[in-house]
A protein has these predicted regions:
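Conserved lysine of the Walker
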Residues: 30
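Pre-Walker A adenine-sensing motif
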Residues: 1-14
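Conserved catalytic/switch belt of AAA+ P-loop NTPases
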Residues: 89-112, 119-121
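Hydrophobic anchor at the beta1->P-loop junction of P-loop NTPases
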Residues: 22
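Hydrophobic positions on the alpha1 helix immediately C-terminal to the Walker A/P-loop
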Residues: 33, 37
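Short glycine-rich substrate-engagement loop in P-loop NTPases that contacts/grips substrate
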Residues: 46-76
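Short regulatory helix/loop adjacent to the ATP-binding pocket of P-loop NTPases
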Residues: 112-127, 143
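Interdomain hinge/linker elements that couple catalytic modules in large macromolecular machines
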Residues: 132-179
């Protein structure tokens, strides 16, 4: 796996009494980053997917009692694609304010959508990060500076999205499929 520069920054912010929000374009590696962070902590985690209708229904009318029952003994609560959940800001606020031993990590593809749903309820209760596609520095640390310099023109043509970078030789096909 390619180590993301944000990983260490986010790990240092965990369990500080605030939610961690990660936004960024689709397919830039948000879910993979969160999986790596959670794995690094070794702590019990509840993973919820905002795309899932059951998850949306489960969080529709949140109360601190229901959330405590849902979270159980988990100490990390991940909400992937959080912007898809109605009143997600209230859900996160209830956890941050009432279940202080639980770290909330939420991801969203659309920073505008997610920001509109969480900013007011989470004022002062969140650390926000924006994840971009892979960077030159991340790739240089992964393969080597010399190799990454050699590949720079290729990267400028096809980009630094993780799927393109990790599927060398299939870039044209991936770009065609993405349209």
């Amino acid at each position: 796996m390619i180590l993301r520069l944000l990983q260490g920054v986010i790990i240092k912010r965990l369990f500080k009494g605030k939610a961690v929000l990660i936004t960024g374009p689709r397919q830039c590696g948000k879910t993979t980053l969160v999986k790596s962070i959670v794995e690094n902590t070794g702590k019990q985690t509840l993973w919820l997917n905002g795309d899932d209708a059951d998850t949306q229904s489960l969080l529709q009318s949140p109360t601190s009692t229901r959330l405590k029952a849902l979270i159980g003994k988990n100490v990390i609560m991940v909400i992937d694609e959080a912007q898809r959940i109605e009143n997600i800001g209230i859900v996160i606020k209830l956890v941050v304010d009432n279940i202080k031993t639980v770290q909330v990590i939420a991801t969203g593809s659309s920073s505008f959508e997610l920001a509109n749903k969480i900013n007011e309820p989470l004022t002062g209760r969140k650390f926000e990060y924006h994840l971009f596609p892979l960077s030159f520095n991340e790739m240089a640390a992964h393969i080597s500076v010399l190799e990454e310099k050699r590949l720079l023109e290729h990267r400028m043509i096809y980009g630094y999205y993780p799927e393109v970078v990790t599927n060398a030789g299939d870039e044209e096909n991936l770009l065609r499929l993405g349209n």
